[in-house]
Amino acid sequence: MCAQCGGPVAAELDLFGALGMPRRLVIEPAELEQRYHDLGRRIHPDRFASGAPAVKEASLKGTALLTRAYRVLRDPVSRGLYWLELNGEKLSDDNKQVPPELAALVFEVQEQLAELREASEPTASESLAAAIREWRGTVQEAMDRARDALAMNFAKWDEGRAEPNSLIAELKKTLSEIAYLRTLLRDIDRELEPPSLSG
């Protein structure tokens, strides 16, 4: 926003700057939401409907940037991926393989899901579904631990407690684990979902 006229500014900003926030990974959700809504009201295209075309265009671009910034920064995983991007990094193919710490869990759950898909007897299906519900709890616990590790990594970045290269490696590892656990939870939930009655 222009400090003089209150109009939108079309300058290229990073997503933190778009919301007027410092580049920090630990973000208070209420503050993020408040900034998003306050800035959104100030640069909303309706406020500039009678303005010059360049001002209208800047308002539209500013609103789009603001919305993208909010969506990315409110989700810790998206924020972590964006942080990697800001640091010239991304998850490589190595980080997209099953993390060794999760290999046994992923294998066991996928095996149980395959058995459930192939089960033809209702009692076998019910028994397998019960076992998979238990596995879901185990996967959710692993997800909670990974999210805690992500929060700790964010705090280390913000406090400058470790060397950036080691923090990037740790961040990549944690984001990779979360990606696998999200996929596993999605697969479990999909298989446990009751069949649709619409036909």
Predicted regions: what is each one?
Residues M1-G199:
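C-terminal accessory/regulatory regions appended to core domains
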